[in-house]
């Protein structure tokens, strides 16, 4: 039976910022004494990291990986750009991608509880505390993403600005179109579409845009209003929808046109299934 209460455990976690497992271990070692437990964690090099937990984190990196396990994306923030490029910090971020893929996770809280692939004796949360101790800054795992990659898919990743913006594009119909998928991912980072296609734009967004367009042409004849509104919607779709956008490397063709051209050349039924785009802090 434990020699400490849940309240003591909660206090130790709040005071040190150290993970649940190590806090339990510390309290068991200290026979429930909070101060002795803090000393125990300090000897392990963990407790002082907790003091950094409330520092603001505006810098960081977005990292992505695709392999046979699936596709993973994680954003991890720190206080300065200097630490964002630190090898110790980058190794921690890389290990998170392995953890997401190993455990098929998209939840930051769930990720914090799994045992780290980088240091199997520590949970991800505990390794984060150790890494904070090493680099001397607060670290925040802001968001995580995982999705399986199916057979017959090609996946492309593009990272811009040393991990400040990252896109992943998923194509169906072929496993041999990675170069095309990467080109589309690069385009996504440059053009930042909000939606995949016209059909995927939510109804409430369409209604909002229609209200805006209507207010801009109020007082004009109905047939003029309809014509102008159609033109404005066309421009909206060309700006907001990936498949309607002009390809950044060849503005004479849309992304849908690019896909159609590649499908005709390869004889494969290519299609952009979905994409993920993350920008630092967005």
UniProtKB/Swiss-Prot annotation:
Function: Associates with the EF-Tu.GDP complex and induces the exchange of GDP to GTP. It remains bound to the aminoacyl-tRNA.EF-Tu.GTP complex up to the GTP hydrolysis stage on the ribosome.
Pfam families named among the record's database cross-references: EF_TS
Ranges where the record places region Involved in Mg(2+) ion dislocation from EF-Tu: 80-83
Similarity comment: family membership: Belongs to the EF-Ts family.
Entry's Gene Ontology cellular component terms: cytoplasm
Stored NCBIfam families: tsf
Subcellular location: Cytoplasm
InterPro entries: EF-Ts_dimer_sf, Transl_elong_EFTs/EF1B, Transl_elong_EFTs/EF1B_dimer, Transl_elong_Ts_CS, UBA-like_sf
Species annotation: Chlamydia trachomatis serovar D (strain ATCC VR-885 / DSM 19411 / UW-3/Cx)
HAMAP family xref list: EF_Ts (MF_00050)
Protein name according to UniProt: Elongation factor Ts
Key word Membrane present: no
GO biological process: translational elongation
Record-linked CDD domains: UBA_EF-Ts
UniProt keywords, alphabetically: Cytoplasm, Elongation factor, Protein biosynthesis
Main location: cytoplasm
Any one GO molecular function term: translation elongation factor activity
